[in-house]
A protein has these predicted regions:
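TPR/TPR-like (Sel1-like) alpha-helical repeat modules
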Residues: 126-128, 141-163
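Generic helix N-cap/helix-start motif at coil->alpha-helix transitions
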Residues: 60-65, 83, 93-101, 127-134, ...
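Structural register within alpha-helical repeat arrays
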Residues: 69-70, 103-104, 135-136, 170, ...
Length: 576
C-alpha cells in the first residue's frame, strides 16, 4: 500500500527559541526530515491519479505494482545518526522529557536498532509512566517479543486516563460497520467490552504457532508511533492530523519512501509513503465477533481486496490461505477434530521478480525448524487445546476435546522461508447420547493395501487437501459412534456425483441432447459392532473416468428404527 498527500497544503511554521534545549532538538528534528527527502528514490512521472481510497488529505492505493523497499542511502543514515547524537545529549539535560524520549526510540527503530530502542525506553527517567510503558511495548514488538510487548502495553493502558485508554483499546478504524456496531453496543459495560475485545484479538492473531499476539501488539505499537510523530515534523511536509492517525492505526507506519519532481528536477512535487508490500487484513468481520463459532474459513481469511487494515507479521509476511481438510469425529460427549496442513506455494507478486525481497530474508530465523499445529480455542474461556509437530510442514494432526463451541486453526510455518499457511474457522459440536448413531465427516486419504483399523492409524495417509488428479485412486474414511448397544444391521451407501456442471452441459441435459451424468453408487450391509465403541471404516475408490471438475462424495447410513445419517465431502479433480 502507498499513500500521498492529495494536494499541497500550507503548514504552520513553529517559532523556536534557539536558546531552549528542547527547541534546539525540535529544530534539528525538523531539519533532518526536511533534508532526508533529497535522498528518497526519485520516480518519473506524476504521482497523481485514481485513488483506491481518500482519507482526509491523503490519496491511497493498494496495488503498488513492483515497488519494494530499497536500502536507505548512506547519506540519510548519517543524517539520522547526527540527529540521534544530538537528541541523546539533550536528553541528558532533560531526562524526563517524553517528547525527546519518543523521538530517540522512533529514530532508533527506523535504523532497525531495536535493542537500543528498548534500552532507551527502559531508562525513561521521570517521563510519564504510561508513556514509558508504551515505548517499551513498541520496542519489544519490534524485537518480536510479543508476550512481553503485550504486558508492557497492558501497563500503559492501565496508567492512561479513561478517555485515551478507550481510544487506544477500541479499534474503530480497523473493523467493518458490523464490528463497530457490536462494539458500540457494549461500550458502556466494561465486562462485555473486555469479552468482545478478547474475541476480536483472538480471531485477529495471525498464527497461534507463534507465542503472543502480534496483531494486537502491532495495534498499540501503531498508536505509540502516532503519538511520537504527532508532535514532530514528517516527510510529507504537513502537520500531523486525524487522517495520519487513521492511516497509521489501520495500515502501520511507512517502510519506504519515494519522491516525484517537476519536469526540471528542481523541486519535489510529492512524497510517497509506502507500507509493507505483503500487508493483509487479519481483523475479523463484525459478524464473527458475537458468534465466533459460526465463522467460516472465508470470514477469517487474511486476504481481501479492499482491506480496512493491513499488517504483515515479521516472522511470516507471506501468510497464505491453506485449504486443507477438516473433519469432525463425534464420540458421545467428546469430539475428535482432524486437520490437514501443508505449506502453500508462494504465488505473491514479487516471488518471480529479479530483485531483492528483503522481507523474505531468513535473518535470525535461518536454521529454525519448520512447524505445524492444530489449535482449538474454547469459547467458554477454557484454555486453548493444541497438538503440534516440529520439522514438518505437511501432514495431519488430531485432537480430542469436550463437545462445545470452538475456533479451530490449522497452521503451518516455515521460519526460514518466512512463509506460513492457515485455515481458521469456527465450529460447534453438541454432545450425542451414547446410544444414538452419529456419523462423522468424511476424510479423504491416499489408498493403502493395508487398511487401517483405527482413525489414528489412518491419519498419516490423509490427503493434504480434498483434491486429486484425473485417474488418481483415493480412499475415504469415516467413523460411526453410538452403536453396539443392540444387535442391528447397518446399510452403507456411497455415491460420487459431479457438482457445478457447466451451463452448456445443463442445457444439453434439459433438452435431452446429452445424457445426464449418473452418480456412481456403491452399497453394502454389515452387522453392527457387538460392543459399544466407535466403528471405523475405510474404503478405496478407484474412479479412473472422473474428468476435471468438482465432485461430492456422499455417505448415507441406514439402520432400522433410526433416522438416516448423512455425511458428504466436496472435492476437486485436476488435470494431470
Amino acid at each position: 500500500m502507498a499513500q500521498i498527500v492529495s494536494r499541497e497544503i500550507d503548514t504552520v511554521a513553529a517559532v523556536i527559541d534557539s536558546s531552549d534545549s528542547q527547541g534546539i532538538a525540535r529544530t534539528a528534528q525538523a531539519r533532518f526530515e526536511r533534508r532526508r527527502i533529497r535522498y528518497f528514490p526519485l520516480i518519473l512521472g506524476s504521482a497523481s491519479g485514481a485513488c483506491d481510497e481518500r482519507v482526509g488529505r491523503f490519496c491511497s492505493w493498494y496495488d503498488e505494482g513492483d515497488w519494494y523497499p530499497r536500502p536507505e542511502l548512506v547519506q540519510a543514515e548519517e543524517l539520522r545518526e547526527e540527529l540521534l547524537v544530538l537528541l541523546d545529549s539533550i536528553q541528558a539535560l532533560l531526562p524526563g522529557d517524553g517528547w525527546l524520549l519518543g523521538q530517540r526510540v522512533w529514530y532508533l527503530s527506523e535504523a532497525r536498532r531495536w535493542e537500543e530502542a528498548l534500552e532507551v525506553a527502559r531508562s525513561c527517567g521521570t517521563a510519564e509512566p504510561w508513556w514509558c510503558a508504551a515505548l517499551e511495548g513498541f520496542s519489544l514488538h519490534g524485537l518480536q517479543r510479543y508476550v512481553e510487548a503485550d504486558q508492557a502495553f497492558s501497563i500503559a493502558i492501565d496508567r492512561m486516563d479513561n478517555e485515551q485508554s478507550l481510544r487506544w483499546r477500541v479499534p474503530r478504524w480497523v473493523i467493518d460497520d458490523d464490528g463497530k456496531n457490536a462494539l458500540k453496543k457494549v461500550e458502556t459495560s466494561s465486562e462485555s467490552l473486555d469479552n468482545l475485545l478478547e474475541h476480536l484479538w483472538m480471531l485477529a492473531d495471525p498464527l497461534y504457532l507463534v507465542e503472543g499476539n502480534d496483531r494486537k501488539t502491532s495495534h498499540y505499537a501503531r498508536w505509540t508511533v502516532a503519538k511520537i510523530r504527532k508532535e514532530a515534523k514528517n516527510p510529507y511536509r504537513i502537520s500531523w492530523g486525524n487522517d495520519l492517525d487513521e492511516l497509521t492505526i489501520r495500515h502501520g507506519w511507512e517502510l519506504g519512501w519515494d519522491r516525484t519532481s517537476d519536469v526540471g528536477f528542481t523541486t519535489v512535487e510529492h512524497v510517497i509513503g509506502h507500507k509493507h508490500p505483503e500487508g493483509r487484513d487479519y481483523m475479523p468481520p463484525g459478524k464473527a465477533l458475537t458468534t465466533p463459532s459460526l465463522a467460516t474459513p472465508e470470514d477469517l481469511r487474511a486476504d481481501v481486496e479492499r482491506p480496512r487494515s493491513l499488517y504483515a507479521p515479521a516472522y511470516a509476511p507471506v501468510l497464505l490461505p491453506m485449504e486443507g481438510q477438516v473433519a469432525l469425529f463425534p464420540r458421545g460427549s467428546r469430539v475428535v477434530v482432524v486437520g490437514t496442513h501443508f505449506l502453500p506455494e508462494d504465488t505473491t507478486r514479487h516471488v518471480g521478480h529479479n530483485h531483492p525481497i528483503p522481507w523474505l530474508d531468513p535473518g535470525t530465523q535461518d536454521g529454525m525448524l519448520d512447524r505445524a499445529g492444530i489449535f482449538l480455542v474454547p469459547l467458554d474461556g477454557a484454555r486453548i487445546k493444541s497438538a503440534q509437530r516440529i520439522g514438518h510442514t505437511e501432514g495431519a494432526l488430531s485432537i480430542e476435546v469436550p463437545s462445545g463451541s470452538y475456533v479451530l486453526s490449522t497452521e503451518t510455518w516455515s521460519p526460514s522461508k518466512r512463509r506460513a499457511g492457515r485455515l481458521r474457522m469456527g465450529f460447534e459440536s453438541r454432545p450425542v447420547p451414547e446410544d444414538v448413531a452419529s456419523l462423522s465427516d468424511i476424510l479423504m486419504l491416499r489408498p493403502s493395501s493395508e487398511e487401517p483399523e483405527l482413525l489414528e492409524a489412518a491419519l498419516p495417509q490423509a490427503l493434504k487437501q480434498a483434491e486429486i488428479l484425473t485417474g488418481q485412486t483415493f480412499a475415504i474414511a469415516w467413523e460411526v459412534s453410538g452403536l453396539g448397544f443392540r444387535s442391528e444391521t447397518l446399510l452403507f451407501e456411497v455415491s460420487v456425483s459431479q457438482i457445478n456442471r457447466g451451463v452448456l452441459r445443463q442445457i444439453g441435459e434439459f433438452l435431452r441432447i446429452t445424457k445426464p451424468t449418473r452418480p456412481l453408487r456403491l452399497s453394502w450391509e454389515e452387522p453392527g459392532p457387538p460392543n459399544p465403541s466407535p466403528l471405523f471404516r475405510y474404503l478405496n475408490l478407484d474412479l479412473p473416468n472422473l474428468k476435471a471438475g468438482k465432485y461430492e462424495v456422499r455417505l448415507v447410513l441406514k439402520t432400522v428404527g433410526r433416522a438416516d445419517a448423512v455425511s458428504a465431502r466436496v472435492f476437486s479433480v485436476q488435470e494431470r
